[in-house]
């Protein structure tokens, strides 16, 4: 009876590998409780069909035409599976990409950028049928010394909803989002920074017009248009958290030790923004980017944004690690981890649920399979497959023994 099963052993091994590939691409997600969530009863976390569920990824670090064999047929293959399986299981309403789509975008010609865009669209798969928004990172457009209005405008024109300065503002399901080109906010006086300031002004005026009488905003508009390019602002009496959802690539400045804490799917403390960034850069697989992982927006820019926009919640990226931080004014900032094996062995993403019946936002941290685990699994399957082939064909085994 055992002999009759021997020829089927290799087939069983192959089927086991197929099942493993499907299972390993399933994300493991866990809700991360913010300070506002701790006071909410458990019933508040029940999903409502009218809630807005947004999947947020960052730091894809695509290589386009410069991708090698391993990149194309292993890492990209699994990243595509991660996107597809996440779409099937989580059923999000929208996708946000918080910068660094390209590993070397600021160094690429337009022809090579096109190959990155093709690779990006290939990865998205089913997400192309959903609303999606992309912001620009330092790897996409470069650092201050190399910022060019024409090149930034060209890159921004390839993504929906971005203006010439790389900023955007949109509303979906009555939730307002504002994305800023945070790279230009690191620089001195330049046209790109002026463009970002104009977006901040406009959104600040609209925020105040919603909260004040129709006659008062007209007077304030003329005052706010007199911009102080050293990031001065007019006093904003609107309470914190009343503004839009803010999307950035660089995190905002953090006071004190800047620590962030949460709990991942394994129950361990997550302090990945500052502490883990002190480890080796993590970008060795794709080179070092223009700015270090510890880089944040300056304190004056951070205060300017808080005063002008009063963001409901802030989502940022760049650090390659997950972080949930509460600023002194009560604003919550969530840093989205890198969703690629190019930046390290611990990829992931964030799912934010904007509830119809309350202001707080539910945030889930989703971890993905480690590259090292997948490689070990492939080696194990290869060894088992060879053994089953030898067992299934005793004559071949006898020949090898001679």
Task: Please annotate each region the language model reported.
Residues 27-44, 106-241, 259, 265, ...:
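Extended active-site neighborhood of metal-dependent phosphoesterases/phosphodiesterases
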Residues 56-58, 94-100, 131-138, 180, ...:
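Active-site neighborhood of phospho(di)ester-bond hydrolases with catalytic His/Asp-centered motifs
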Residues 51-66, 174-188, 244-249, 313, ...:
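Active-site-proximal beta-strand elements of phosphoester/diester hydrolases
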Residues 19-23, 50-53, 91-94, 127-132, ...:
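Loop/turn elements at helix/coil->beta-strand transitions in domains of secreted/extracellular proteins
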Residues 2-9, 13-35, 39, 166, ...:
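Binuclear metal-dependent phosphoesterase catalytic core
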Residues 60-63, 101-104, 138-142, 183-187, ...:
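Solvent-exposed loop/turn segments at secondary-structure junctions
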Residues 1-114, 119:
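N-terminal active-site segment of His-dependent metallophosphoesterases
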């Amino acid at each position: 009876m055992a002999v009759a099963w021997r020829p089927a052993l290799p087939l069983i091994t192959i089927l086991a590998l197929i099942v493993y590939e499907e299972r390993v691409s399933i994300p493991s997600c866990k809700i991360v409780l913010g300070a506002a969530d701790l006071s909410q009863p458990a019933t508040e976390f029940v999903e409502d069909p009218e809630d807005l569920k947004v999947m947020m990824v960052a730091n894809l670090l695509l290589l386009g035409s410069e991708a090698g064999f391993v990149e194309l047929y292993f890492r990209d293959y699994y990243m595509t599976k991660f996107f597809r399986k996440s779409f099937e299981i989580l059923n999000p309403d929208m996708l946000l990409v918080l910068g660094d789509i390209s590993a070397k975008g600021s160094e690429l010609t337009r022809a090579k950028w096109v190959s990155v865009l093709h690779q990006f669209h290939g990865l998205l798969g089913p997400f192309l049928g959903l609303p999606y928004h992309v912001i620009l990172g330092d790897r996409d457009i470069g650092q201050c010394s190399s910022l060019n209005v024409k090149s930034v405008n060209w890159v921004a024109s390839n993504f929906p909803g971005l203006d010439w300065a790389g900023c955007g503002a949109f509303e979906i399901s009555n939730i307002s989002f504002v994305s800023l080109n945070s790279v230009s906010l690191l620089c001195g006086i330049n046209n790109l920074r002026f463009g970002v300031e104009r977006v901040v002004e406009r959104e600040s005026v609209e925020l105040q017009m919603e909260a004040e009488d129709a006659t008062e905003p007209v007077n304030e508009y003329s005052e706010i248009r007199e911009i102080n390019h050293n990031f001065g602002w007019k006093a904003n009496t609107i309470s914190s958290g009343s503004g839009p959802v803010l999307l950035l690539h660089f995190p905002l400045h953090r006071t004190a030790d800047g620590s962030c804490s949460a709990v991942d799917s394994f129950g361990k403390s997550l302090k990945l923004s500052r502490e883990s960034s002190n480890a080796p850069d993590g970008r060795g697989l794709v080179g070092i980017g223009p700015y270090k992982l510890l880089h944040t927006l300056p304190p004056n820019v951070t205060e300017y944004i808080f005063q002008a926009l009063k963001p409901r919640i802030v989502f940022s990226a760049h650090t390659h690690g997950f972080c949930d931080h509460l600023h002194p004014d009560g604003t919550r900032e969530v840093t989205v981890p890198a969703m690629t094996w190019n930046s390290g062995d611990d990829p992931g993403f964030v799912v934010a649920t904007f509830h119809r019946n309350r202001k707080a936002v539910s945030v889930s941290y989703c971890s993905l399979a480690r590259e090292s685990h997948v490689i070990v699994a492939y080696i194990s399957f290869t060894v088992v497959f060879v053994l089953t082939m030898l067992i299934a064909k005793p004559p071949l085994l006898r020949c090898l023994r001679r």
